[in-house]
Amino acid sequence: MQTAPAIARIAAWLVLGLAALAALASTPAAAANKTKNVVLIVLDGVRWQETFTGADESLLNEKYGGIWETEAALRKRFWDADPLRRRELLFPFLWKVVAKQGQVLGNQKLGNIGQVSNPFATSYPGYNEMSTGHGDLPVKDNEPIFNPNLSVFEWLNTRADLTGKVAVFGSWQLYKQVFNTPRSHLYIQAGASLPPTDTPPTPRQALLRHMFKTTLPHEDGDALDALVQESLLEYLHTAHPRVLFVGFGETDDWAHSGRYDMVLASAQHGDEFVRELWETMQAMPEYRDQTTFIITTDHGRGSGLVDWKEHGTPEYPGSENIWIGVIGPDTAPLGERHDPLQFKQAQIAATVAALLGSDYRAAEPKAPEPLPVLRAN
């Protein structure tokens, strides 16, 4: 008779084996898509309101927005009477490139509504939902437990042509738990500590390691977004990953600190990081015209003069609302979606897989269908 540990090991191998077979079985469908690489980028806690209408005028002051620079200086950078111009000032790449060559979803003023499925609208549940395809999670907030759920990234890493080509980069240290570092075997750089390496660092890698070591992290050991970006760009050139998760967290950090001026600045920087990453990859033959970016957020926030600083349901209504931008060779250039559409954060996982020709729902029956952003082949 098998012992309990032995049976558990056999069961674990069977699960991984079935997941690998499911991934491999759907690999040939990838030939129908031009996308060979997918990058999921998250700007933490960015509201749909700022995404579609730019800066909130009622918060461009010290009393309610906690700003440190002068109101005149802040308005010069981020304000225009036209909301379409305001959003371009805040997110120039999203609106001048993604919205022209791809699609942007989630403008609730147009009846285009995106929401989380999980009942919490906090970070860990949001990252779990978008990466696993469902909102089931034994935590309701940000407890540092290793995620028991299988993510689409871990699943894709079992596909023969993608093994070792899936990586996670982010400023939040809990990505190690979200993507379950011990089990998933993904390359994960999360927070202010860098993963060990068996190879001698390049001069740039050595410099980055020194900068991580000598730069004070954010609260709770989170890294600066700029350091995440520089590390990611170096990894891109040395490891040539095909599937990436990228999480920038300063937008949420500054909102919780009540600094609306820094929320706007970090959102604009995040947009710049996305532009830089896109242009870098388009300049590399292995990525050019065969890479899709999905840009989104993990949750929304409260509204009004005070509650914009926080999120979570039911305490802060509106926290459940999200938005998504998609650009790539398999996404029609429909721009800002004006159709009455309702979509869920959970659809992102199957979308990542579908772009690469795989059916994630074969491994995770709880996952809904992909987002309606792919061209009909």
Predicted segment positions?
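Bacterial N-terminal signal peptides
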Residues: A11-A23
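Acidic, His- and aromatic-enriched active-site or binding-groove loops in soluble protein domains
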Residues: T132-I145, S184-G221
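Long, well-ordered early-domain segments
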Residues: R75-Q177
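Metal-dependent active-site segment of extracytoplasmic phospho-/sulfohydrolases and closely related
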Residues: V39-L40, W48, H269-E310, V352
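Active-site His/acidic residue clusters
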Residues: T181-R183, E230-E276
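Active-site-proximal N-terminal segment of extracellular/periplasmic enzymes that hydrolyze or transfer
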Residues: A29-Q103
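Polar, surface-exposed loop/tail segments
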Residues: S358-N377
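Substrate-binding rim/cap in mid-to-C-terminal beta-strand-loop elements of soluble/periplasmic
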Residues: Y127-G133, H311-L356
